[in-house]
Amino acid sequence: FRSCANELLKNTLPVLYDELERCQKSLEGYLEQKRAIFPRFYFVSNAAILIILSQGSDPLQMQPYYEKVFDSVNQVEHDKSDKGKILAIKNISGSDEERVKLAKVCLASGSIEVWLGKLVIEMQKTLKALCETAAAQCAEMSLGDFVDANCAQFALLGIQFNWTAQCQEALEKAKQNKAIVQDTNRQQLVVLQELSSWCLNDLKTKMNRRKIETLVTIHVHQRDVFEDLARLHRSRKGGLDAGDFEWLKQARFYWRPDAKDDHGPSACVVAGC
């Protein structure tokens, strides 16, 4: 109680509080500048950002913090002879690992918020290139070979590309070929049965099992969607075509060489109205 009555303390505490407020505002302003450069920092706490920024001079020290700023990326692979070069991104879960090699080496030098932004761009360019490859492969390879050759994201995308292409072709040709809609409906069931049969096999890793189960889950929905369309086609006078709203409102996946995105010509387009 005697300390609380001390005049010096009573006069000093308000000053210290004002200084603390000033420091807090300065810190918020500093972190806002960093967030403006690398917007993913908006989803990270102030304390975590300060730790990340303090590691900027050594890219290897960033390893524990990638999962705070990226989804499904919790490590990167550095060049063994030059730690400033990032060669690949990884998703590691227990003993399982999913690795994607970057199309172009990313240099982890300079301010950490700057090179993290460059890493995002290289990741996007790499995934776009893999998307283009998946779009070309999915119609040419067997289902099993295609799924085995691609990580989960692109195995799923390839199945969605195929489903969209097959269903759209059936609806476009429905007036000339009376059987094509039902044939395509049966084809989607065959795909689902093949995917489901893999779940009974030894898939080696939990990550691979999760990948196959995801493909099954999504294709169950896709198969149900087209089954409903096939039923509507049978019941409606004149049937359906590819311009019908019942088809256009579905999520459809295309690789468009004539489209473009932030990284140049051609693009993956997800359509739906």
Task: Tell where the protein language model's regions lie, with residue ranges.
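Amphipathic alpha-helical packing elements
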Residues: 20-76
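Extended, well-ordered alpha-helical scaffold/bundle regions in very large, multi-domain proteins
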Residues: 1-12, 16-19
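Extended non-catalytic scaffold regions that mediate assembly and binding
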Residues: 3-5, 40, 89-90
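Extended, charged/polar low-complexity intrinsically disordered regions
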Residues: 63, 67-273
